[in-house]
Amino acid sequence: MGTVPDPLRSAKTSLIAASGKEDDLGEPQAASPRHRPALLCKNANGFSGAPAEPDLSPRAAAEALMQVCEHETTQPDMSSPGVFNEVQKAPATFNSPGNPQLPGSSQPAASAPSSAAGRDLIHTPLTMPANQHTCQSIPGDQPNAITSSMPEDSLMRSQRTSNREQPEKPSCPVGGVLSSSKDQVSCEFPSPETIQGTVQTPVTAARVVSHSSSPVGGPEGERQGAICDSEMRSCKPLTRESGCSENKQPSVTASGPQGTTSVTPQPTPLTSEPSACPPGPEKVPLPAQRQMSRFKEASTMTNQAESEIKEVPSRAWQDAEVQAVASVESRSVSTSPSILTAFLKESRAPEHFEQEQLRVICHSSGSHTLELSDSTLAPQESSQCPGIMPQVHIQAAAAESTAFQRENKLASLPGGVLKTSSINLVSSNAQHTCKEDGRLAGMTPVREESTAKKLAGTNSSSLKATAIDQISISACSQAETSYGLGKFETRPSEFAEKTTNGHKTDPDCKLSDSCGSISKADHSGSLDPTNKGDAREKKPASPQVVKEKESTGTDTSDAKTLLLNPKSQESGGTESAANPTPSPIRKNQESTLEENRQTKTATSLSLPSDPMGDSSPGSGKKTPSRSVKASPRRPSRVSEFLKEQKLNVTAAAAQVGLTPGDKKKQLGADSKLQLKQSKRVRDVVWDEQGMTWEVYGASLDAESLGIAIQNHLQRQIREHEKLIKTQNSQTRRSISSDTSSNKKLRGRQHSVFQSMLQNFRRPNCCVRPAPSSVLD
């Protein structure tokens, strides 16, 4: 057991990667041997990990899977009887527990075919899985239609054809991988289930184990096929739930690894699979649509909870490392108020404008935020730059970051997108759409709109479901969104909405995110060029969406340079405003996001200030925006201090710095007046509270009044300190004199007493002996 998971995992990873490539290449056969171990690994993981099926012993499952994996890896044809024997042993263990799962007739049928086969290998347990496998392979087709008697070659061919067909089906991303390998199918079948996390995984694993066993006799095979059909029917809802009905079908072929004996049953499922595959794709889209409907429902639910979800992504943005990064200028400005004066005029107007944009961005990102800030950022970023994307996604979610890495690769390679989508059930639609987008960047907006609607549902749903399936679903939807470059644009209506909300707003969101969450360099750096390139490439798709993306690309590029031209931002903001999502919702989202950001003191200052700065053409303006926000607070503080009569010299200086340029001219006169007024104020009689109404109500500049008050307070403090010092010195002197006199007196008293004792004459008995006598 200990050794089984590691090789399986390694094989799984390599096989999964290979399977994705093979699926994209349309070479499932070559990939099949690789995928088989991967699927087996998944099965082993599913068995051991699937608590739902206590009947299956994890050890037996792992051992069988290991054996099958070894057999598959060593023998893609699965002809070696030794391997079959090993597999039979493991499946035997599985079958005993797994039999309750399998139809009762499947075991006798399996045993009968094994006896009929009369092969050295004991396939009884394997035949059990073979029946199940045939059931799986025949979602719509009856397994009995294909008999195990079919020659291995024809079966293999049918398997290949079915496998080829399956990879073509985008709805079978997992299935594609599964179908790529004849034997893989059984292994992979559980793998999609394992991905789905349904109990089916162990069941399918047991079935696969039984399926991989000996070929079923023609009539027995038919019986088993019928049983399997019932099983598949029962499993179909699960597969549909998992959204991988096709994947399960390909998984049926997994029996191949068990050997030619199992291959015969495999061809049965496989041959049935080719026939089943054509309906399978139809069925697959149905489950995908169902999933989409589920996701849409989930999305509606998430939309209902948008405010909460938006808050979470906004928090994530605020938590992003980018927030921690503060431009030196902003810090210097915050520390030195004199610098603020130059920026105040420029930055204040941009603040309102940028705040609106940020709100729009926040809103769009918020609406997209339902999917997650990652999803909004992911579509652009994932499509734009895989390297940067993982970082941003890592901030949001590690799983999503991995998915985004894949998506980034996919964004660069439509095949890659298909791979990731193949992994995801939703990705089946994403694959089609991605393929269409990759092949036809300028596909008619209607098509892509329909696909965009599906993908939009899948994206929002998958992104919303990202918490559970972040890697798989988010990879699909985000791969879609990353292809969303084409898809979003080609989907002018919905993805124009989502892209405007999510993608286009993503540029805005990138501004807000760059301001608040994801590293601006990441957004602008990798995402911007990709956005620009993607937008340019996909301009034919839909000029409106392309324009939006271009604006987003320009915005992101501006964010990159931190020189966001107000024009580009305005265009982005206007476009985002033009986005189908209602402005009131955005406003609500913006308000919520802004509130969330503002609630966070330091981060809120930096975050809103960043978006503010972003709208301003210069990166330096970002710092002014922050400083500007800080500056208004300072004046409020100064006013409070003035009211409280507790002005600090720094506060007064800050006020002077905060005063607009017009006041600078007055500063000279003010300083003179301050001197005069301060002199006058000093002469004023101060009441208990520190100042009389004459002084408090006098028409004095804040600076002069503050200075006068400070001078008065300082004088009082000095006087008080002098008094304290004098008192302390007096008390110390008295204490020192007392202590010294006491010590002296005590010493004297002691010495007098001792002298009296010494001088007192004692009787001879009590006379102190001489010291020498003691020594003697």
Swiss-Prot record:
This is G protein-regulated inducer of neurite outgrowth 3. The keyword Phosphoprotein applies. Residues 101-118, 208-217, 604-620 have a biased composition (Low complexity). The keyword Transferase does not apply. The modification Phosphoserine is found at residues 332, 365. Residues 1-37, 68-312, 518-637, 723-748 are annotated as: Disordered. Residues 520-552 have a biased composition (Basic and acidic residues). One of its GO terms (biological process) is neuron projection development.
